[in-house]
Amino acid sequence: MKAVETQAEYLIKEKDFPTLLKTLLKEGMVDKIIGAEAKVSKKSGEVDRFSISPKLWEKPEEIESFPVSNLITYGYARTDSASKFLHASADGAKNEKIALIARPCDTRALIELSKIKQVNLDNLFIIGIEDRGMTLNVSRELRSEKDLDTTKIVKEKITDDGLLFLLDDGKTKKVGIEIADNCSRCIRKQPIIADISISDIGIPIEDENIILKVHSDAASELIDKLGIKADKIPSDIKKTHEDKMAEILKAAEEKRAKDLEEWNKLSQKEKLEQLQKCTM
């Protein structure tokens, strides 16, 4: 399946993303939004920025913030996904209009769910994510990083050679955490259905902007109603983004081919042993 076609491209401030979500509710474009929030420890009350859960919003005032860079980088906690939450907690948008933020793999799952009448695609406003993939078990992996105070992290970004953090003093810190193995060989880095998509690919971590792409007439209508500054994407940033996306896809295709070649060399017993392992 091909990625969804793009009508227009903008830069918006990451901090303005909640306004976009609020506008969907205020203008009656959707009845509910499947948003996201960082989990809070029941013991300490501390926010865990590495563990993100879906959350259902019905009123604009419920949306105070949104963990954009967290969701792009970590995805939802392992047992959650946008498509699963939509089906289980929002009745598959069968009788209400629902907005949700979906990774490329979520958009494929939505199509499959619609085939068995578990999701009504016509009632969805989909905000897709263009991404490299996501990192797993970051909180656990960072325990060995003695010189990194995780309470100082204000933003995160997956790079070519690890996970980069922006700290509250403006400094950055990179650690050797790569995307999940399955993500590294996935060649679907863009949503195949979406009204809007967002991406941080090609944008430096210090930059306050994210890329926003419009894919539908409903999304164009939303942009007109936003009341925030949405600048057409400059040609240099557009080229950097597109070049990096092409580079990421090429690397994924090469990894996929290499892994398939190695898989075909395995015996039946070895293949069964590999399938029994958890790869995510």
How should each PLM-predicted stretch be described?
Residues 1-261, 268-271:
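Iron-sulfur-associated redox domains of electron-transfer enzymes in respiratory
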Residues 270-280:
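An accessory alpha-helical subdomain
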